[in-house]
């Protein structure tokens, strides 16, 4: 089937209302106003104690290439009815703004700005949907992977979710996010090529079925592959699968690298113990027992509690789909806008207290105790505040303000780094291995109580006094303005 508009520009990866708002701004002449938006989420996923930020590399690619193609413009004009003068304006648009962001792999928490975008009102508005799409998905997968890796610890974790992912790009970028979260390899060959990450795979039940019996299938596989992992549960794991894997491994000897056996069904606790015993008795003490079959952190924790002898964990569906929480819920809110040549803060008020935004351009600092090298909490301050010059900080809960403490002898780590400055890319995103190491190093700053899988302690994310006062003043002013308008209308 032929399509008239057959290219696939990511600049149209947006909601229609973003373009509608862009046209409103442009026709009203306010499109060049400077605006500051912040991207954050309100609630940690999976009831976890932290999240792992992922998606910066994709965001960099998106912003670097942001422009409307001739096909985009033709579609907007011919199919959606936008007028020629607005189309002409869009034809010259690119991202000329500034992006400050947390590093990819940063440990992040609810209500702290992960990204801060400073651009013209039109540019900042048009990129909202794509940035949220990128960060919402990849951060969710990286966080799920980190939860699983936290249970597996030093054992190997493999990402096996490609066929169950929501589509091809989700599989590829999800594989990358899983490695950021701590996984060692993926089965996705495209992701391996695209991101230069390790790939790993065995064979399917179809191989055994094609040859009708396990011995022949394993033998043929060994004849064509040096590294061998045999899938042993096609017929009978204990009486047929494992014995035939051992038989082929002995026959081929040093001609192959017998990595181990994979279990993909049945009672994994029982079967892994049987497999370990049978492999050891056959002299294959270094052979690994690899398990898959709808695993997640909860199943893995239960298997470990039952004494399962599993060395390598292949996790697919429940990782790549973020099975128990398929959405992160990140939002993108305007916090400051230019008026009469001056930046003025802005706030969104809601009857839901958690949806009231914090006005102003802000930075996030991690307050690290220099004596025990653990984090005391994250501290959100207005851009103009010089936190590094402070010898003593008052940290207090932004809602329950009576919960407070004073911190001395600390280092304030600025979590934001410049990515784009006035449209120019100024940041070199590190490779996966470096990001992965950064995640693990960063997790070392937190007490175990914040990292446990079930009912973790709430990590402090506090506002500076100046930031909090600014927010309270805005709430007060908005309420008074509404009261005045109601009074005058009566």
Task: Specify the residue positions occupied by each region the protein language model found.
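N-terminal, Lys/Arg-enriched amphipathic/low-complexity engagement segments
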Residues: 35-91
């Amino acid at each position: 089937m032929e399509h008239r508009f057959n290219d696939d520009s990511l600049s149209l990866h947006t909601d229609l209302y973003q373009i509608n708002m862009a046209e409103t701004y442009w026709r009203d002449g306010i499109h060049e106003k400077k605006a500051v938006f912040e991207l954050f989420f309100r609630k940690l996923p999976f009831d976890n104690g932290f999240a792992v930020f992922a998606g910066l590399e994709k965001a960099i690619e998106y912003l670097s290439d942001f422009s409307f193609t001739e096909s985009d413009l033709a579609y907007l004009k011919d199919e959606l009815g936008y007028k020629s003068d607005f189309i002409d304006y869009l034809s010259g648009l690119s991202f000329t703004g500034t992006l400050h962001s947390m590093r990819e792999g940063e440990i992040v928490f609810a209500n702290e700005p992960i990204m801060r975008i400073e651009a013209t009102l039109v540019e900042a508005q048009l990129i909202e949907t794509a940035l949220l799409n990128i960060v919402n998905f990849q951060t969710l997968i990286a966080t799920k992977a980190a939860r699983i890796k936290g249970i597996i610890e030093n054992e190997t974790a493999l990402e096996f979710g490609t066929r169950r992912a929501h589509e091809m790009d989700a599989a590829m970028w999800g594989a990358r996010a899983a490695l950021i979260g701590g996984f060692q390899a993926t089965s996705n060959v495209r992701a391996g090529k695209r991101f230069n990450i390790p790939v790993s795979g065995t064979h399917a039940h179809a191989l055994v079925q094609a040859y009708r019996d396990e011995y022949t299938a394993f033998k043929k596989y060994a004849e064509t592959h040096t590294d061998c992992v045999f899938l042993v549960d096609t017929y009978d794991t204990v009486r047929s699968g494992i014995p035939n894997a051992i038989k082929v491994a002995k026959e081929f000897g040093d001609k192959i690298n017998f990595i181990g056996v994979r279990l993909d069904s049945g009672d994994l606790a029982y079967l892994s113990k049987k497999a370990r015993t049978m492999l050891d008795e056959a002299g294959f003490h270094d052979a690994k027992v690899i398990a898959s079959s709808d695993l997640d952190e909860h199943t893995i924790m239960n298997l470990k509690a039952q004494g399962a002898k599993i060395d390598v964990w292949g996790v697919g569906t429940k990782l790549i789909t973020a099975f128990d929480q398929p959405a992160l819920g990140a939002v993108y809110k305007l916090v400051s806008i230019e008026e009469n040549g001056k930046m003025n803060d802005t706030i969104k008020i809601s009857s839901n207290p958690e949806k009231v935004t914090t006005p102003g351009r802000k930075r996030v600092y991690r307050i690290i105790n220099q004596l025990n090298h653990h984090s005391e909490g994250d501290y959100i301050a207005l851009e103009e505040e010089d936190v590094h010059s402070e010898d003593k900080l008052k940290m207090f809960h932004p809602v329950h303000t009576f919960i407070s403490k004073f911190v001395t002898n600390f280092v304030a780590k600025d979590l934001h780094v410049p990515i784009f400055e006035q449209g120019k890319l100024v940041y070199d995103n590190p490779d996966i291995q470096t990001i992965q190491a950064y995640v693990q190093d960063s997790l070392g700053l937190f007490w175990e109580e914040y990292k446990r899988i079930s009912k973790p302690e709430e990590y402090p994310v506090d506002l500076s006094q100046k930031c909090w006062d600014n927010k309270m003043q805005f709430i007060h002013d908005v309420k008074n303005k509404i009261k005045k308008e109601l009074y005058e209308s009566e």
